[in-house]
Curated annotation (Swiss-Prot):
Signal sequence bounds: 1-28
Name of the featured protein: Hemolysin
Locations listed in the record: Secreted; Host cell membrane
Membrane topology: Multi-pass membrane protein
Gene Ontology molecular function: cholesterol binding; toxin activity
Record's function text: A cholesterol-dependent toxin with hemolytic activity against host red blood cells. Causes cytolysis by forming pores in cholesterol containing host membranes. binding to target membranes, the protein undergoes a major conformation change, leading to its insertion in the host membrane and formation of an oligomeric pore complex. Cholesterol is required for binding to host membranes, membrane insertion and pore formation; cholesterol binding is mediated by a Thr-Leu pair in the C-terminus. Can be reversibly inactivated by oxidation.
UniProt similarity note: Belongs to the cholesterol-dependent cytolysin family.
Alphabetically ordered keywords of this record: Cytolysis, Hemolysis, Host cell membrane, Host membrane, Lipid-binding, Membrane, Secreted, Signal, Toxin, Transmembrane, Transmembrane beta strand, Virulence
Motif mapping: Conserved undecapeptide: 465-475
PROSITE patterns: THIOL_CYTOLYSINS (PS00481)
Keyword Transmembrane: yes
Membrane-spanning intervals of the chain: 196-209, 216-225, 294-303, 311-323
Amino acid sequence: MKNFKGRKFLTCVLVSLCTLNYSSISFAETQAGHANDITKNASSIDTGIGNLTYNNQEVLAVNGDKVESFVPKESINSNGKFVVVDVRKNHLQRHQSIFRLLDSVANRTYPGAVQLANKAFADNQPSLLVAKRKPLNISIDLPGMRKENTITVQNPTYGNVAGAVDDLVSTWNEKYSATHTLPARMQYTESMVYSKAQIASALNVNAKYLDNSLNIDFNAVANGEKKVMVAAYKQIFYTVSAELPNNPSDLFDNSVTFGELTRKGVSNSAPPVMVSNVAYGRTVYVKLETTSKSKDVQAAFKALLKNNSVETSGQYKDIFEESTFTAVVLGGDAKEHNKVVTKDFNEIRNIIKDNAELSFKNPAYPISYTSTFLKDNATAAVHNNTDYIETTTTEYSSAKMTLDHYGAYVAQFDVSWDGFTFDQNGKEILTHKTWEGSGKDKTAHYSTVIPLPPNSKNIKIVARECTGLAWEWWRTIIKMNKMFH
C-alpha cells in the first residue's frame, strides 16, 4: 500500500512538471510569434512604402484651366465713352510646398497627421490616413523653453495633438513670455485677380475659400466690369514640428500592416505623407476692388498697400473714389473671423496692426503647414500649371481740338484721324476721317472747334501759310503726326 501511494505521488509530480514545462514552452512560443509579427508588420510597411513607384513632382501636379480660344479685343460704347476690352492669355506655373490652412481641414492638417498625396491634397483638401499610431514627439520653437519645448503625445490624434500644443504654449506664457519676445515674422503676398485657378495658385489658397469669404465676383472681373487685387498678410507666432521617422513604420502601431494601409488608400497614385510642421499665427486677407477702368489700377493698389500717404497725394484719387476694401481675419482674439468692408483703407491698416503679439487673450491660429513623403522624407510640393485670361478695360472720352489763326496771312489746315473699332475676331478696323474744312483758305482772325469722337487715334494736323513767293507759295509751319487720343 505504501509503495502504491508513493508511485501515485510520483506520477502526479511528473504530470505537474510536464504541464508546467508545456506551459512555459507555449508562452515562449507565443512571445516569439508576437515578436515575429511585429518585425513582419514593420518590414511590410517599410518595404511596401519603399516600393511605391511615383514621381514627387508628377503625383502632385495640377493642370488648371486651359484657354483654347478667345477674342483678343472688343469695343463698346457706354455713356458717351468708348470702352476697349483688351484680353490676353497668360500662363502661370508655381511650385508650392507651404499650404495655407483653412477651418475645413484643420482636423486633417495637425502636426504628425498622416495624409494621402492625391488630387484632394493638391486642392488643399487633404484626406487622412487613419491607422493606430505609436507615440510621437512634437516640438515648438518659442524662445527660451530649451528642453521644455518638446512633448510626447501617446496617441497622436487631432484632439490629443491640439491639447499638447496648448500645453506647450501655456508653459511658455506662464514661464517665459515675460522675459522673451517673439521675433516679428510677417509674410506678405499680393496679386491681381483674373481667374479662380490663377488667384488660388498665386496666393497658395483654396479659391473657394476666397470666393466665399471675400465675395470675389469672378464674372465681373472676366468681363472687365471690375478690377480686384487680393493681398495676404501672414504673421507667424510659432511653429510646431513633428519628429520625422527614420522609417515609415516608426509612425504606426505594431499591429498595423501595409495591407491595412493599402486598404485605406495608399497606392502609387496616393503615396503617404506626414504633416511635418504647422505654423501658428494669424492671416489677414485684403480685397481691393474698383469699377475704375483706369490702366493705373494695379499701380494704385500697390501704392495703397505700401504707402500710408498715397491717398492724400491725390495721384490716384479718382480710382480710390470708385473702390471698396474688404478684410477678413483668421486668428487673434476674435472668436469668429472678423470681416470688415470699408471705403477707408486706414481701417484695413489698423486691422493689420492690431493684435500683432501672442498672449493669453490673443492666441495663435493654425495658418499653414508643410508635409513630407514617408518614403524619403522629401517635402511634398504641388506643381500648378494654369492658363488664365487677363482682361484690361480702357475708357476713352471725346475731345475737342481748337484751331486759332490770327496771323496776317492766308492759312490752310489739314486735319484727319482714324476711328477704330474691332470685328468679331478682335481685329482692329480703322476708318479714316477728314475734317470738312481741310485744304481751304482761312484768313485772320479764324477760330473753330473740331469735335473728336472717343475712338479717335492717329490724329494728324498740318498747317500751311501762304508766303506770296513764287518759288514757295505754300510753306508748312506745323506738322503733327501719330498723335493718339
